Regions:
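Conserved acidic carboxylate
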Residues: 8
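Two-component/phosphorelay signaling modules centered on CheY-like receiver
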Residues: 11-31
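Acidic, metal-coordinating helix/loop segments flanking the phosphotransfer/catalytic sites
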Residues: 32-50
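Acidic catalytic/metal-coordinating carboxylates
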Residues: 35-38, 61-64, 82
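Short amphipathic alpha-helix used as the core "switch/output" element in two-component signaling
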Residues: 41, 63-75, 92
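Receiver (REC) domain active-site loop signature in two-component systems and cognate sites
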Residues: 57
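C-terminal output helix
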Residues: 86, 106-116
């Protein structure tokens, strides 16, 4: 079972992401956070196999949350999602270490492919077959 955290301040988007992921794979355990502060609290109290994180949120934005994730759980892949599809933010999040960046409204096939890839990569990391996202050393 894969445990996925969705950090999204827009309830409608959060619910859609939850529903799409649950329909994709009934074994996904989905946890929701309503903003960056709530997301960090959940990250600090539980381990996740994947995190989906909005960028523009009140209290703490997604870039701040991503930095926290990379510090506290660097091998947890994070997919950044934003309705403000500006290239600068996408580049910054990828440069920092996000697994992927997806614009809202998300193309559901692209989102699901990214989720599958991130979880597969995470399984390789857990098994020690890939050192981590940053080193780019593959032992496959």
């Amino acid at each position: 079972m894969s445990k996925i955290l969705i950090i999204e301040d827009e309830e409608t988007i959060r619910r859609v992401l939850n529903k799409v992921l649950t329909q994709e794979n009934k074994t996904y355990s989905i946890v929701e956070a309503v903003d960056g502060v709530d997301g960090i609290s959940k990250i600090n109290s539980s381990k996740f196999d994947l995190i989906l994180c909005d960028i523009k949120m009140p209290k703490k934005d997604g870039i701040e949350v991503l930095k926290h994730i990379l510090k506290e759980c660097p091998n947890t892949p994070t997919i950044m999602i934003s309705g403000h599809g500006d290239l600068e933010t996408a580049v910054e999040s990828m440069r920092l270490g996000a697994f992927d960046y997806i614009s809202k409204p998300p193309d559901l096939n692209r989102l699901l492919n990214s989720v599958r890839s991130a979880l597969l990569n995470n399984n390789f990391v857990k098994r020690g077959k890939v050192k981590n996202n940053k080193s780019k050393e593959f032992n496959i």
